[in-house]
UniProtKB/Swiss-Prot annotation:
Enzyme Commission code(s) on record: 3.1.3.5
Keywords, sorted A to Z: Cytoplasm, Hydrolase, Metal-binding, Nucleotide-binding
Name this polypeptide is given: 5'-nucleotidase SurE
SUPFAM superfamilies assigned: SurE-like (SSF64167)
Chief site of localization: cytoplasm
Uppermost EC category: hydrolase
Record-linked NCBIfam families: PRK00346.1-3 (NF001489), PRK00346.1-4 (NF001490), surE (TIGR00087)
Amino acid sequence: MRILIANDDGYLAPGIAALVKACEGLGTIDVIAPEQNASGTSNALTLNRPLSVFEARGEPVQGFRVVNGTPSDSVHVALTGLLPHKPDLVLSGINQGANMGDDTLYSGTVAAAMEGYLFGVPAIAFSQAEKGWTHLDAAAATARAIVEQVLAGGPPTGPWLLNVNIPNRADAASLPRLVTRLGRRHASEPVIRQTNPRGEPIYWIGPAGDARDAGEGTDFHAVAHGAVSITPLQVDLTDHAMRGAWASRLGVPLA
């Protein structure tokens, strides 16, 4: 079993070291991660400059491969030229903060896992539901347990993609686990306007809005009620239910 582990918080983030440690003994582990925090970069690939890769030194990051790019860059480079073999499983995380609902569209953590999925490799993204790295060991133990469950039936076949959100609790490993669907948030809060020393306006992206679809069955509901959320994801963005309506409205046939 060969496992590739990545993240979006950067190679020095505690979450990736915890995930690597938790997965020891499950197979041969390769680690690749961005040099800097790349949260919110989604599936971006760096196309306007070359990428550099170096090997980190010192514990707990000894041997980690580090890329001066995005999470998707990291996994892409690993799968298309850096590694001499194709991994059997891609893991991403553990992220600091939830990736639920439409947050997943912006998430570098989910994107790193998705890059593996796009290359035909089964993948799992792991996130802690709140920031601060509290109870990280419990989250890592939960991630290990889920990976063990996945592997229990033999090497994964796929591709498939799971998005896992873990409550920040000391008892996370013993919490119920639910297969959920994505909820939805309100739009983000307004941008925050400030002025730089030259008197020019600058803008900070506002914080995420409140959940607006957080009913039973959603990832938001599961985490809020003390459960680990496991959401199967796919890449197909086609609105299949609306194809017929749009064909009729535009006066064109369905393909």
